Structures are given as C-alpha cells and as structure tokens.
Amino acid sequence: MSTFNSNFKLGTYLTQVRQENPLVHAITNYVTMNDCANITLAAGASPAMCESRDEVSDFVPLAKALYINIGTINQEHKDSIYLAAEKASELEIPIVLDPVGAVAIKSRLDLVKDLLTNYNVSCIKGNNAEIKCLAGRKGHGKGMDSLDLGEDIQMVNSELSEKYNTMVLATGKTDLITKGNITVKVSNGTPLLGRITGSGCMLGILISAFIGASDNDWEAGIAATVSMGVVGEMAEESISSSTDLGSFRVKIFDHMAALTSKELQERGNVSEL
C-alpha cells in the first residue's frame, strides 16, 4: 500500500537527479524529441534517443529508466518498444508509458493495453481523456489533445493503478497522481503549458529521470510533476505577454536548469485527496 508523507522533501529528488545523472532511454516521438532531450539535460539527467530495433536490447541495460511515448508510432517503433519493454522488465528498470493519442486511435489503445498487461510499467502518464479511455470510459480527444473535463478522474486513476499495479498520472488544470488507494493533487503549472507542443512529453521524460535516480518511485514522480509545473510558472513570470510562446518555451529550459531544491520545495503545491 502506498502512503503519502505530506512533509516529504520535494527538493531532495531534484538533488538526486543532479547527483546521480541517470541515463534515460527514450523511445519517443519526432515532434518533441529535441524538447525531451533538452529538458532532461536541464534537469541534470542524460537522455538517449536510441530507437533502432537492432540496438535497444543492448542499450536498455545501460539506462536507469525507459520512457516510451507513442506520439509518432510506426512499425519499427513498435518492434523497438516491445524489445525494450521486455528487457527493462527483465532487469527491473522502471518504465514510464505515455499513451499519446490512444483516445483517438484504436491501434494505439490496443498497443498500450498490451504493454500494461505484459510488462512492468512503473508509471502511466496521460491527459484526462487518455487515462479515461484506458479505463474503458468515454474520453473526448481532438487529435493528441484532451478536451475532457475529467470530473471522475480520481476514481479512474485508482482503478487503473490497482488493475496494472502502477502509478497513474492524469494531467489537466490540476494533475492527479495515484498509486493504489492514495491520490495527490499537484496544483502547480500554468495554462500556457497547454499552448505549446511538448509540455506533456517533457513531463513524461522528467518523471523517468526522477524515478531513475530514486528508490521511491511514488515521491519521485510527484516531485517531477511539481518541477514541471514550477518551471512553467517561472517561465510565465519571465515573459512580457501571454502571446510570447516562443520565449516561454525557451524559458522553461532556462528555469529548469537554474531551479534549486529550495525553490522547488517552497513553490510546490501538493495535497492529498
């Protein structure tokens, strides 16, 4: 059973990432691959975008975490994902799974369910619509974006967490993170994160980095989620207008690189539901 310690030190997990410099093996999408690599570096971890089916089985053992994102899936990606997931599960390397577009495309939904059923996934991270879709609810999606209000998302999170024995993160206006019978709400962030492509993918690989550096997946996942929200807030504070989206995107990397454990601790807004 998971427990939530309201006094846990968010900043400890950022410090661990920077001390351990975990290697994150990412099989991710082409749209946001560069953003994922840069946010990982800014946080203090090391990314590797190794996706060839001829290489992944040899590369996974070198990593501390595996991040799977199906945003631009193709057959070679599928082959590589299965090989990587098998090796990671064999070696007990944590897997973070981002079911991008599963709400809109049945073949993606089938792939994600198969991975969850057959491999040891440490965390599922998706928007409200994707998470509800995985649980068999009707989610409303427009392409890769969520249009779902997620009124019952806490219950859905709990069902998925217990079914697949994994941590579940549903992102939205507030982010809900569930493991077993415990759900916490992260209230950091800004609507501007939803106006640039890649913010969700960056969060997914950050979770991978934080989990890869820690023995406590639960608290590390929470800390990673807070980190992304906090640097989003800082980036918004650094621009002159809400239309400065290019500057906002760059500022995310700047503030992640400069983020201190003290700032993360002081600005984190986490509560148990």
UniProtKB/Swiss-Prot annotation:
Example GO BP: thiamine diphosphate biosynthetic process
Top-tier EC class: transferase
CDD domains: THZ_kinase (cd01170)
Residue positions binding substrate: 49, 198
Species whose genome carries this gene: Natranaerobius thermophilus (strain ATCC BAA-1301 / DSM 18059 / JW/NM-WN-LF)
The name this protein goes by in its record: Hydroxyethylthiazole kinase
Pathway per the UniProt entry: Cofactor biosynthesis; thiamine diphosphate biosynthesis; 4-methyl-5-(2-phosphoethyl)-thiazole from 5-(2-hydroxyethyl)-4-methylthiazole: step 1/1
Gene3D superfamilies cross-referenced by the UniProt entry: 3.40.1190.20
UniProt-listed InterPro entries: Hyethyz_kinase, Ribokinase-like
GO molecular function, one term: magnesium ion binding
Enzyme Commission code(s) on record: 2.7.1.50
Keywords from the UniProt entry: ATP-binding, Kinase, Magnesium, Metal-binding, Nucleotide-binding, Thiamine biosynthesis, Transferase
Family, similarity comment: Belongs to the Thz kinase family.
UniProt binding sites for ATP: 125, 171
Named cofactor requirement(s): Mg(2+)
Protein task: Catalyzes the phosphorylation of the hydroxyl group of 4-methyl-5-beta-hydroxyethylthiazole (THZ).
Catalysis performed (reactions): 5-(2-hydroxyethyl)-4-methylthiazole + ATP = 4-methyl-5-(2-phosphooxyethyl)-thiazole + ADP + H(+)
